[in-house]
Amino acid sequence: MDWNRVEGNWKQVKGKVKEQWGKLTDDDLDQISGSREQLEGKIQERYGIERDRVRRDIDDWYGRQTWNW
């Protein structure tokens, strides 16, 4: 997984993140600013899911995306 590309294209990616994890606020997404660690933490906070599960969910989500860099 090349998370650096996600960080570099965060403005385009955050809409897809919001579709998947609708409990994340626009402020959350701005704070995350492409950081995977921040994304994991916010998802864990908003959904009350264990960190390992969050990591798997992000990996699954990432693998399903079609990126148009």
Task: Give each language-model segment a name.
Residues 1-69:
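Intrinsically disordered, low-complexity, hydrophilic segments
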